[in-house]
Amino acid sequence: LEDIRFIFATHFHIDHIGGIGTLLNKCSSETRVLFDLHAKGYIEGQENLAPMKNWLSGLVPTIRENYTRIGNLSHIAFESLAGVPLPVFKDNGRLPYTDRVSYIDMQGALLSRIGFSDWEAVPTPGHTPDSISLYNEKTQELICGDLILGRHDGTGYLNRFCWDEDLASDCFAILNDVLCVRTIYPGHGEVIRDNVNAFAKVIPLEEKGGK
């Protein structure tokens, strides 16, 4: 863990950031946490988290499909309530490591080098405004946060639990057109693999009755 230089947060939700402080305590004092620039307002307490849609039709099925991955309660022992997308929690949680945070400013670019190996940052808003992914052109891998979720059969689907369904669909279409991806690591669920195009195994929102 002492060799970890960066911790990359795909978006500012508690299930993705709630354990970062615990991990940081085991890393070097030089380790930085990377967020998309859109998350700065949340972290500094100047902006509320974007409201989420489809709690019942989007979130509940995901919990049902993935709850068995929780090995013990320590896996959900979050260090603060930062990242809960409900107004009632807006003043109840601040990150305990704000001095270790850096921001990725894409400046309108589709891809941006961020300093580690062949990985590039890719803006993927839709699930949240600050959602950002990692893409490796050499290995054709994509770490996509909660834009895409995986199923037990190796397929995937666009996440209906989101801030903006249309934006998520548009973002997915752009990624499919521009990137060559054979392996997708979703925020929840099984890894999605295909020898030619892993996006072909992802069900768009319109095919799930999302529109």
Where in the sequence are the language-model features?
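Soluble, non-transmembrane catalytic domains of enzymes that act on hydrophobic metabolites at membranes
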Residues: A9, I17-L24, L110-L111, N159-D166, ...
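Short, solvent-exposed polar/charged micro-motifs at secondary-structure junctions
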Residues: H11, R113-I114, N195-V196
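A conserved mid-domain beta-alpha-beta active-site/ligand-binding segment of alpha/beta enzyme cores
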Residues: S102-M106, L110-G115
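Metallo-beta-lactamase
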Residues: P96-D99, S117-N197, K201, E206
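Short, solvent-exposed coil/turn elements at secondary-structure transition points
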Residues: T10, A39, Q107-A109, H127, ...
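Short secondary-structure boundary/capping segments
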Residues: L24-N25, L111-R113, S133, N176
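C-terminal regulatory/interaction regions
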Residues: K208-K211
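Active-site HxH/HxHxD metal-binding segment of metal-dependent hydrolases
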Residues: L1-I104
